[in-house]
Design a protein with these regions (language model features):
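Long extracytoplasmic/lumenal interhelical loops at the membrane interface
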Residues: 249-281, 307
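A juxtamembrane structural motif centered on a specific transmembrane helix
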Residues: 1-4, 8-9, 326-379
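N-terminal membrane topogenic signal
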Residues: 11-26
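Transmembrane helix boundary and interhelical junction motifs in multipass membrane proteins
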Residues: 168-173, 252-257, 268-270, 287, ...
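Hydrophobic alpha-helical transmembrane segments of multi-pass inner membrane proteins, especially
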Residues: 23-39, 45-238, 245, 275-335, ...
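Aromatic-anchored, glycine/proline-accented short structural segments
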Residues: 239-241, 254
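N-terminal low-complexity, intrinsically disordered patches enriched in charged
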Residues: 42, 75, 179, 260-264, ...
Length: 379
């Protein structure tokens, strides 16, 4: 057994096992994001629009801060965080409750705190907290029992219920993907998976039938079901698909996208950032970006396989599930194969909360890799 109470923190020995591929891939994708955010937001300064380098500078600073956060997370270690999980989980629930009362509303969702000129979305960092909480709980046994799975469901349902009230359907789906991926890797029995599937379907139907979702969110889902629905969401999807089609094989050239420069695609620096990539760099550029993300995902999965305990394995599985679902959903809603739910492309979309969350998550996976020999060292 790994002694989580007194982990061995021999820094020189641990640093010898730093994985260089993981941060290099992460940085490469993030730098592509900086360029794409600049392309999506560039333009002359006016009374209504910041200078053309405003978003570029902010995104670059966020990437630099994210790199620091990734290093700190890897250095501090996932096992040290293990002991604080209950306290941090309760704190997350407190923040999610507080944002409903004191947060600001952005695009119909009360999900952000305003601190000076900065906005902070607690549900983003809550993804990391959920991963740690589920890894702690599910990692205690080789094959989680029914009661243990039930508690895992409750651990997920707590933050999900508060996020639904914001309402933020996209983040709810990400939390669900995290939980689903970790439950599968944890080795939950088939009958328990079946029950979880029924609960998931029932919950989704309940949310859709309730009055919790905003009207614009319902319209987005309606467009996915009915392509002929005449709504703002259908127009947005059409413009996104036109932008992707304009790119062709090699794209129109960096900063030369017609849909982009005409600002016809909504939220193109955040939710629809992939349309900027596809229009300006074409199929080739989109394939390169997705290829880099694929390599990053493969590395996260491989590190999970190398973990020397179930806690590290499940942390890696949670990060893998989070990134995979967000990339698939972000690209899918730009191309029309998935409903529009407002999920950012990890490391590429503009936004500090999402970017920092992803960097911290990768840092935790780095910690798993750095400490994969501790168990053998104490054997």
């Amino acid at each position: 057994m790994v002694d989580l109470r007194r982990p061995d923190y021999d820094r020189p020995r641990v640093l010898r096992h730093v994985d260089l591929v993981l941060p290099l891939l992460t940085l490469a994708v993030a730098l592509i994001g900086v360029v794409m955010v600049y392309s999506a937001t560039r333009g002359p300064a006016t009374d209504l629009r910041p200078a053309e380098t405003f978003y570029l500078g902010r995104q670059a600073r966020l990437v630099a801060l994210g790199l620091v956060a990734m290093v700190v997370a890897g250095w501090y270690g996932h096992r040290r965080l293990h002991r604080f999980v209950p306290l941090v989980y309760v704190g997350m629930l407190g923040l999610l409750g507080a944002v409903l009362a004191t947060g600001i509303e952005v695009r119909g969702a009360r999900a952000w705190f305003q601190v000076g000129g900065l906005q902070f979305q607690p549900s983003e960092m809550g993804k990391v907290v959920l991963i740690l909480a589920l890894a702690t709980w599910l990692g205690r046994t080789e094959e989680p029992s029914g009661p243990r799975v039930a508690v895992a469901v409750l651990l997920t349902a707590g933050p999900v219920g508060l996020i639904i009230l914001q309402p933020d359907l996209g983040t709810v789906l990400v939390y669900g993907a995290i939980a689903a991926g970790m439950v599968l890797v944890a080795g939950v029995k088939g009958r328990h998976l079946f029950i979880l599937g029924l609960l998931l379907v029932t919950g989704l139907v309940g949310v859709l039938e309730s009055d919790v979702l905003e009207e614009y969110q319902v319209r987005r889902l309606l467009v996915f079901v009915d392509d002929d629905a005449e709504t703002t969401a259908s127009y947005n999807l059409e413009q996104a698909q036109v932008a992707i089609g304009n790119g062709g094989l090699t794209g129109r050239g960096l900063f030369q996208g017609t849909q982009n420069n005409s600002a016809l695609v909504p939220e193109q620096q955040t939710d629809f950032i992939f349309t900027v990539v596809a229009e300006e760099t074409g199929f080739v550029g989109g394939a390169v970006l997705l290829g880099l993300v694929g390599l990053l995902l493969f590395r996260v999965w491989r590190i999970g396989q190398m973990a020397d305990d179930r806690f590290g394995l499940l942390v890696s599985a949670g990060v893998f599930s989070m990134l995979l679902f967000q990339v698939f959903q972000s690209v899918g809603m730009s191309t029309g194969i998935m409903p529009i739910t407002g999920i950012p492309f990890p490391l590429v979309s503009y936004g500090g909360s999402s970017l920092l969350t992803t960097f911290v998550s990768v840092g935790l996976v780095q910690s798993v890799h750095m400490r994969r020999h501790e168990r053998q060292g104490r054997a």
